[in-house]
A protein has these predicted regions:
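Short S/T/G/P-rich N-terminal loop/turn motif that feeds into the first structured element of a domain
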Residues: 1-54, 63-66, 92-103
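A generic structural motif
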Residues: 56-58
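An amphipathic, aromatic/His-enriched active-site/gating alpha helix that lines ligand/cofactor pockets
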Residues: 61-93
Length: 103
């Protein structure tokens, strides 16, 4: 499985704290989103949100980014602009650097 960062943002108007329709989606899907993602072979590792910036970062594992794209199109993606980015851990970066330096 690959590691991905999902960077999202929404307008102040689309914020679930300000928008009843978005809030309804959050309340409907939020409590069960980890389970729903798991059914699509997506493991949600962490979910971070910045209320002041109206942005979020979720870290997930999945076999490919298209699974994530499809899942979010029916969920959080309805009211957010999304960017799905492949990630590696910092320890992976260190290991790659060691290989380049023949450690």
């Amino acid at each position: 499985m690959g590691l991905y960062g999902i960077y999202g943002s929404h307008t102040t108007e689309a914020c679930p704290l300000n928008n009843a329709e978005t809030r309804k989606l959050v309340l409907e899907h939020g409590p069960k989103i980890v389970e729903e993602a798991s059914k699509q072979n997506i493991k949600i590792i962490n979910q971070y949100h910045s209320g002041l910036e109206h942005t979020f970062l979720w870290v997930v594992e999945a076999n490919d980014a298209h699974l994530i794209q499809s899942f979010f199109a029916t969920n959080v993606g309805k009211s957010n602009a999304l960017k799905i980015v492949p990630l590696i851990t910092y320890s992976d970066v260190i290991e790659q650097c060691k290989k380049l330096e023949h450690f």
